[in-house]
Amino acid sequence: MTSDEKSATRDIYDPNTLPDYDREFIEPDDLRQFEKALNAPEAAPLVALNDWRPVNQRVRKSRRTKPRRSKDETREGVLYTVLKWPFLFTVFAWITVLGFAYTLTRLYIFLYEQFVTWRGKREQLRRELSMQTNYQDWLKAAQALDTYLGNLKWKETDEYAYYDHLTINKVVAQLKQTRKAAEMEMQNGRPGLSDPPAVEELCFLLEACVKNNFAGVENPRLYSETYSGTKDLVQEYIDEVHSCIRLVLDSKQISNEDKYQFFKHLDTNFGRTALCLSGGATFAYYHFGVIRALLDNDVLPEIITGTSGGALVAALVATRTDEELKQLLVPALAHRIRACHEGFTTWVRRWWRTGARFDTLDWARQCSWFCRGSTTFREAYERTGRILNVSCVPSDPHSPTILANYLTSPDCVIWSAVLASAAVPGILNPVVLMTKKRDGTLAPYSFGHKWKDGSLRTDIPIKALNLHFNVNFTIVSQVNPHINLFFFNSRGSVGRPVTHRKGRGWRGGFLGSAIEQYIKLDMNKWLRVLRHLELLPRPLGQDWSEIWLQKFSGTITIWPKSIPSDFYHILSDPSPERLARMLHVGKQSAFPKIQFIKNRLKIENAIMQGLQQCSSGGGRVMSPILSRRRQDRAQEHADRMVERLDQSFPERQSDYKDESHYAEVSDSLSATSSRPHTPDARRSSMFEEMRRQSAVFFDDPDMYADEDAVTT
């Protein structure tokens, strides 16, 4: 090791090299406001029986102190009462038997792969692959392993059952031909002015093929047969589409307005990519390595969501620039992770007194450094351009979850959302979300309601991301320990092909994979039966079935490989050496997915660059769906302002009605002179007028959303 390498190694363990290491971002007043909101009594509705009965009537205190289930959860009937607990114990006993059988099956598959498939030269190449610390060296080792296993022949063959190779061949040929014709016109001019330019035909072709998973080119199976890359035809298609998009962007034969509309269509059809970081207590520190691998290869998506421990990592990423992240994601970061610094006697006394192991105010102080103080979701987006999303679950089991971001809660303070997303019952009590007012002070958000761990219901909020940001391609970094135990891809995963029969077989043979799938599906079935029959108890007032039954994977799922000691340190701060290992493992788990992500973002970034260059402002441009959502919100706010003015000044309404009457008479006279009488048009205009009038009393912007979607 040279002197420069030794110096670099010392630097990554030196906490003084971290940006803002000694800086405390949060203000003491912010913590005092947060403490005040936590200690505030729960708001209770005031209801009087009638005009002469007092509101706060003194009633006799109930003798019952033990909490009971609410009325709507109580099941009537003799059979339910008699059979509930015997059936519950029987199912749990059967699940225990299935769990033991599943453990034996996984042990058999592990031994089969270790002693039957991984031997000799291939085992040596695989060990070299796992020792690489950067993507370039890893890619060379992966290509060497593919060459030894004979995977290059699979890349050269176009036919494959999981995508339409005939369609892709035709599209590539047409794109090449049209692109060359457009390039000739750009150099030599158009031969005939009456014919449409070739670049317009190229736009029509791109609008037809630039779609999410067009003809199956984004099927993960296309990247699961080799350690590096995919089919040569698929790679050729990706490169050709990118070249054509660049040509349209540079063309002078299309106006900027037409280009902007063109890229809006492509963005809507192609969608966006999001990085989803799961929860998992201190297992979430594996996310740091995943982030570092994506950052070093320029494939870190702009949309990031995190839950529980993943929310802390996502907040760090969304509030820092790329240069700051490269300095922060090193082993020295462990010196700033102090959430579990208290001793055994301290947290035991707190748990006995409050029901929570950790102190909420101390966690708020520690968490604020990762969020740059009381930064809001909007401020983070304006600083870095990244869209942060945090899943929060209300303490009330019947209320819906929220996905906090700069659209749904722009002024919400990030560290309060991170604490709420990490508030596991028994670990941290439910917390109040805080919002930043115009004067910079903090106040309770959402009427002071309390929130808790988002992993309990929505660890990976795929539906909400699609609703708000048109996300249809998700990169999930999954580190939940109770899910990792059951992770198994019988046919391999992206960049991790099956070792059996040169990647064409099943892990552990077909019989081993079949038994594994059957046992896992049977356990899942019985858990669903218990949930739908409402037989599961609710410890700490929470339905815990969703921590097993929700979807935990995405289009690409990254599973960092944990070790047994991680379970022992599940609620303890990492040392620099332990964090260095987690960074290495996280990067290693992300390397096989880099090429797939590069191909996806290659087209997506080209589309977003086209939107940015062709927009009138020329600045940062959000997706058209996001801009439309902002416009709708601004219009709704303006409509409510007009309504308040009308209520305050009645004479304004009468003047407006008179003016609108004269305008309608004038429009009707001009309409009768220019076009024939159309009863259908008049009927529709009458319904439109009724709808506008009803909106004054029923101001619901979603009332006619479906009708507008059909008519547009």
From Swiss-Prot:
Motif GXSXG boundaries: 306-310
Tree of life domain: Eukaryota
Family, as annotated: Belongs to the PLPL family.
Cellular location(s): Membrane
EC class of the enzyme, as a word: hydrolase
Main localisation: membrane
Record's protein name: Patatin-like phospholipase domain-containing protein AFUA_1G04970
Organism: Aspergillus fumigatus (strain ATCC MYA-4609 / CBS 101355 / FGSC A1100 / Af293)
Database matches in PANTHER family: NEUROPATHY TARGET ESTERASE/SWISS CHEESE D.MELANOGASTER (PTHR14226), TRIACYLGLYCEROL LIPASE PTL2 (PTHR14226:SF66)
An example Gene Ontology CC term for this record: lipid droplet
Basic and acidic residues composition bias: residue spans: 1-13, 632-646, 652-664, 677-688
Transmembrane segments: 85-105
